[in-house]
Amino acid sequence: MTLVSTHELDNSLSDNTKLIDASWHFLSNRSGFEEYQKEHIENAIFFDLEKNSNKQKNLPHNHFLPEKKDWEKALSKMGISNSDKIVIYDNSDLITSCRCWFQFLYFGHRPNLVFILDGGLKKWKLENKKITNKETKIKPSKYFAKENTHMIKTKLQIEENIKKKEFKLLDARSKERFYGNVKEPRPGVRSGSIEDSICLPYSECINPKDNSFLDKKIIDEKFKSLGVIDNNTVFSCGSSVTASVLGVAYSLINNKYMPIIYIGSWSEYGKIK
C-alpha cells in the first residue's frame, strides 16, 4: 500500500519512521524550504527537489534524476538508512511527494518501506493536527543506492515506441497544454504533445478539497476508460514531476506495477531546436 492516512501517521510519529517534507512549487516565488522552516510536521526532514535533480545545460528546466553517488550523499546527509520506513508529504498543489517517492524506488529503497501521506500537509492542517517550526535534529548515516534503470524511459525509447507501440504513454499535463491550446510555461518548449500519447491530467486523480487521492474505484475507471489495463504503461508530463502522481495513482489499483516514467518528458521532447 503506497499511501498512509493522516490518522495512521498521527498515531505512529514516535515510531522509527523518517518523515520527509518534499514541498516544491512550479515556476513560483514560493519557497518550499522557507515554508518548511515556518511550519512542518514534527521531526520532518526537508527534501529539496531542485538540489536532488540533475540539471542539464541544454534542458535547465527539467528534473532528470541525480547521479547515484549524489543521491547516496544527499540521503546520508539527511540521516536516512536503507532499512528506514519513509513517509513523504508536501504542501504543493503538484503533489511533489510523489516524485520523491519515485526517486526512492528508483534508487532501490524497498517499496514496502516508502509511503506517501495521503492529502499531505493540507489535509493534516485541515484536521488541526500538530505542526511545529522546531528544527529537526539529524544524525548523518551511510546510504547505499542501487538503480532500477528499467523504471525510466529515454527520448530514443519514446521515439521507437511510436513505431513499435510496445507500451502506452500517458501525459499528466492539463488538456489545454496537451492539445497545444496554450503556451508552454517553460521557455524554449513548443506547445503540443508526443504522438500517440494519451492525456490524463494528474489533477483528475486528486480531491482538490484536501489533496487526497480519489477512491480507487474512480481511479480504476479513469485508467480503464483510456485502455490502460496492464503494466505496459509509461507516464510523462512537463518535466517528470507530476508524471509521478499518475505513477502513484496506477500503483493504487495495480499492486504489481512499478512506476515507469519518461524522465525527459515534454520539456525534452518538445524542446525548440
Where is each model-derived feature located?
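Active-site neighborhoods of enzymes that stabilize oxyanions during catalysis
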Residues: M1-T6, K55, L121-E195
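C-terminal soluble interaction/assembly domains
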Residues: T233-F235, I253
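Short, glycine/acidic-enriched loop or turn micro-motifs at the edges of active sites
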Residues: W24-F26, K51, S174, E204
